[in-house]
A protein has these predicted regions:
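Cytosolic-side membrane-entry/anchor segment at the start of a transmembrane helix
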Residues: 1-5, 67, 216-221
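Membrane-interfacial, low-structure loops and terminal tails that flank and connect transmembrane helices
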Residues: 137-151
């Protein structure tokens, strides 16, 4: 990879994170209304995902340009995990007060869910510490065994366990909230948290794929399994969003319904990464360099939809939160474009 292109792909996650923080701060300063509070806090929290994606980009690009660096393999996942933990603590702090307002309740749950995603993405960074073994293993055969440089089976299983446990936590928590969906804050927070949990579940597939390909244990059975898993979760999340939008006439349905559809777009962006790694594993794919276009399209979907919603929010404040949050989700999708491009450069056979 060209060193200048490498730096560009490293900078994209940081720039997108700064945009999320800047827009979130601007929204918070604009008004004290509850819609501004929720949208501003959620936008700022999305920077944690961008930070975690930056650590992933840095680790892989550094290997492509300079080789494996054990210092980077330790430092950058720690940075990502630190950002995710701070984000989860921030979300929990909003929920820990004695008299939690509705806007704090919703924002706290969403921010905590964003922190869970950031932790899962940081696990992608941690599992990518020996990314160069993937094209090497793909050029060989399963009979070659596990390379001595690869993570042990125990460490690999621990890495996969992180998104699995966070997915279970998010699922149980969101279902608990939805059991009291007649309370509006529970209804909104429960649906959005369930969508965020779907992203964590998608990242199980990505972490498992990277770990197993690094260890040369990527089986024929799971070759396409994770692709189906991620596309299924993305589609279910989009359908959930559509269901929320059409299931009632209440204004409270607008934010969770629209945001769920765009969380499905993030799932599809993750699908592009899982699909790419499956496509180039012990085979040649001439279209591999087109796969990074998937997160570009999902990014454009989020941004164009946000622009329409911003106009609609002039007359209906129910559209205000999604019109702002979708800009941040578009930024996350564009950050995923840089990661998919890096994976394509490092693993695809030209």
């Amino acid at each position: 990879m060209n060193i200048y292109i490498g730096w560009l792909f490293k900078l994209i996650p940081l720039i997108m994170g700064l945009i999320c923080i800047a827009l979130g701060g601007f929204v918070l300063e604009s008004s004290g209304q509850s819609e501004y509070f929720v949208a501003g806090h959620v936008l700022i929290s999305l920077a944690a995902i961008c930070l975690a994606l930056f650590t992933t980009a840095f680790i892989i690009i550094s290997q492509l340009t300079r080789g494996v660096n054990t210092y980077y393999n330790t430092l950058f996942p720690i940075i990502g995990y630190a950002g995710s933990i701070i984000t989860m603590i921030w979300g929990w702090a909003l929920l820990a007060g004695n008299d939690v307002m509705a806007d704090e309740f919703v924002a706290g749950h969403v921010i905590f869910g964003v922190g869970m995603i950031a932790a899962c993405v940081s696990t992608v960074a941690a599992s990518s510490g020996h990314f160069l073994l993937i094209p090497k293993n793909a050029a060989g055969s399963k009979s070659d065994g596990t390379p001595v440089q690869a993570y042990s089976s125990l460490i690999g299983n621990c890495l996969i366990a992180v998104p699995v446990l966070l997915t279970l936590l998010g699922f149980i928590w969101s279902i608990t909230l939805l059991r009291s969906a007649d309370i509006t804050p529970h209804y909104v927070a429960g649906h959005v948290l369930l969508g965020l949990t779907a992203i964590c579940a998608c990242l199980i597939g990505l972490v498992a794929t990277i770990v197993h390909q690094t260890r040369n244990t990527f089986s024929t059975k799971e070759h396409w399994l994770w692709c189906y898993w991620v596309i299924f979760l993305g589609s279910i999340t989009v359908l959930q969003g559509i269901y929320v939008l059409v299931s009632s006439d209440a204004s409270a349905r607008l934010a969770p319904g629209i945001i769920l559809i765009c969380l499905g777009m993030i799932c599809y962006s993750i699908f592009s990464k899982v699909w790419l790694l499956a496509l180039v594993w012990r085979r040649t794919c001439s279209l591999a360099n087109r796969i990074p276009m998937i997160p570009v399209f999902t990014c454009l979907f989020c941004l164009f939809l946000a622009s329409f919603l911003a106009e609609m929010a002039q007359t209906d404040m129910g559209y205000f939160i999604p019109s702002r949050v979708l800009v941040g989700l578009g930024a996350v999708c564009f950050t995923l474009f840089s990661i998919v491009s890096i994976l394509e450069a490092g693993s695809a056979k030209k």
